[in-house]
């Protein structure tokens, strides 16, 4: 199910006709934002910061994951769209991590992310916090 959710996200974000429409109407594109230093166009995403619990009787060990997912544009309604998008994005997040009997992954923090075309401009984040764990 998680693999299918991730593949569905990729299909949506890479749909050429959808991207053409969004480009025409908003001047921006849907994107899976690279976690590297360069993004070549204005884009919006969701960064999922996570960690792991190595054993149930152990303290939580925080390991940072940065898995961004693209959204088409950022405006006053972006928060609502972020929340609509989160369910699928979180499923895809867990699809990347192997869940064993003694290891459980969690999402510690969720942040909308705006990346501008100007390399001098860093990303802005708006605090949207969520803790999601699988036990």
Q: Model-derived features: where do they sit?
A:
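Amphipathic alpha-helical binding modules
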Residues: 99-102, 118-127
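The feature marks short-to-medium sequence segments in extracytoplasmic or secretory-pathway proteins
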Residues: 90, 103-106
């Amino acid at each position: 199910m998680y693999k299918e959710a991730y593949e569905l996200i990729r299909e949506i974000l890479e749909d050429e006709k959808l991207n053409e429409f969004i480009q025409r109407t908003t001047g921006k594109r849907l994107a899976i934002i690279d976690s590297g230093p360069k993004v070549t166009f204005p884009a919006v995403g969701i960064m999922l910061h996570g960690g792991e619990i190595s054993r149930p009787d152990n303290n939580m060990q925080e390991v940072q994951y940065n898995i961004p997912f693209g959204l088409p544009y950022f405006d006053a309604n972006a928060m609502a769209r972020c929340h609509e998008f989160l369910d699928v994005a979180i499923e895809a997040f867990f699809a990347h991590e192997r869940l064993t009997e003694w290891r459980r992954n969690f999402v510690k923090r969720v942040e909308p992310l705006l990346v501008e075309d100007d390399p001098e401009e860093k990303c802005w984040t708006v605090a949207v916090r969520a803790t999601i764990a699988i036990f």
